[in-house]
Amino acid sequence: MFDFEYQLKNLPDKPGVYIMKNSLGEVIYVGKAKILKNRVRQYFRNSKNHSEKVKAMVKNISEFEYIVTDSEIEALILECNLIKKYKPRYNILLKDDKHYPFIKVTMNEDFPRIIVTRNMVKDGSKYFGPYPDVSAVHETVDLMRRIFPIRTCKKYIKENGENIRPCLNYHIKRCNAPCAGLISKEEYGEIIKKAVGLISGKNNDIIRELKEEMEKASMNLDFEKAADLRDKMLAAQKVTEKQKIIIGNFENEDYISLYSDEKDSCVQVFFLREGKIVGREHFIVENTAGENEGDIIGEFIKEFYSGTAYVPKSIYASAGEDLNLLENWLTMKRGSKVEIKIPQKGEKKDIIEMVKRNSKITLEKFKIKLLSDKRLNENILIEMTEVIGLEEVPHRIEAYDISNIQGVDSVGSMIVFEEGKPKNSDYRRFKIKTVKGANDYDSMREILTRRFKHGLEEVNSIVNKNLSLSAGKFCVFPDLILMDGGKGQVNIALEVLKEFNIDIPVCGMVKDDRHNTRGIIYNNNEIDIKSNRKIINFVTRVQDEVHRFAITYHRSLRDKRVLHSVLDDIPYIGEKRRKALLKHFGSIENIKKATYEELMKTPSIDKKAAESIVSYFRGRKGE
């Protein structure tokens, strides 16, 4: 039993990170503190001043632990890492944690490529961006490939390496085939130099050169070549026009503000790149009643910039807490000075007010759509209840599916729809443990047995400890179970429920010969739902989602198994080094051929690891 009084009394008077856990040992909140003793004790005292979210969290805390750090900045870095690792339910977790795309020129390769990436790493490549307009970035890269004969393949091509047969791109004059040794590293480098100049907006000579070549070809009556050069010139002009939007002599700045109603908040970020607003993002933060604006924005900054690949020089916010600490952390992340300012007047203040107004509009639209969707989903569930003949409206629906290929890497999936919407946080995956071969019925029996056994155990634990249902992973039972299959799968589910003395209606989702949803099996009867477009769309959506979730997990296990058979058997090669090797060399075949010196150039590969790889593959050659 966790002794709260003793643990609170003995908290250290130092900076660090505290980790709150529920009765199941799951991490539900991670926070950092300048003085651990003061911060952690606050949660268990003066509850009148707590926000509704904090009150709900404290009710679910069964124990806590802490990690002492040397400084507050270390605590902040550790906090961000632990939030990424555990994704605690009471921390602000941005649902749209995407990186904005960069244009990447792989200068660390003998024959560089121009690609789109969302991750910026120190690997010797040149990066341009980030750009919020994803489609514009892809269009720019496509245009660059039309203008310059640059390779697009992922092959590991080395100067003076083994020559291979060139692909179709060479024959249609989209690549100069460095893979076949048809262009030198120096000649290829000159092409890349021109391409980089065009992307950066610093070299528009290429347009003039293309125009001169086009006119020359036209005079020589080589109209096919002239037309090709004309298309390249127009593409180059289009690239230059795009760069005018994103290249200039202005600073890059982000502006952050929020609007809160009585329950939730909308945080909005406007991105200024080279003096122009080039994009914006909004994030709905739920259950913020009672929290002040500075705390929400401070938490948002930590979450947002720990995920994004790009940190601007200046960030302007409408409020904020621990700004000096956040500035120091972002400065470390960026590698140069970052300032967070709260403008009080002038143009910057006007932009912040504009961001705030947009946050209000976005939150209001979100609530209106939420209400509209809620009414629509309610109507669908009511109609489905009547058509199928259920006794009650199914507010919570669980759907199950099995995925395998000839019994290998067999997995099961459980997805959840609440009030007609997916509840991703309650999705669960099961690796089949007791069934050998392709036996979907026994596999389904196993995952349902595990699901409801865990659920009943959690319910008993929660009742005994007087906790809320949110403390468990399986303790909330559905109002309806949907099986991806016919009568056989339905009967398996009913048998499992009977064993546990649980009464939940079970339906089967059946498809026609074209693999389209056809009807619902309930009480051994097939109910035709084709005439009701809303119901069939909903059931199809559930069926597609449970299948997607199952097959995604199956593929991840299959890929892991395939990779494990080779790289994971090599001493000193863990997951991080495995990924680095595949990223650097492109394939296992290229890793096998790599020399010790080439391996040493791979990020994270040290002398011992390189020797281990060489030794492993030499040994396999003799097998």
Curated annotation (Swiss-Prot):
Keyword terms: Cytoplasm, DNA damage, DNA excision, DNA repair, Excision nuclease, SOS response
Subunit structure: Interacts with UvrB in an incision complex.
Primary location: cytoplasm
This protein's name: UvrABC system protein C
HAMAP family: UvrC
Extent of the signal sequence: none
Superkingdom per UniProt: Bacteria
Domain spans labelled UVR: 204-239
Keyword DNA damage belongs to the record: yes
Pfam families the record matches: GIY-YIG, HHH_2, UVR, UvrC_RNaseH, UvrC_RNaseH_dom
Keyword Cytoplasm: yes
Cellular compartment(s): Cytoplasm
GO CC list: cytoplasm; excinuclease repair complex
A Gene Ontology biological process term: nucleotide-excision repair
Family designation: Belongs to the UvrC family.
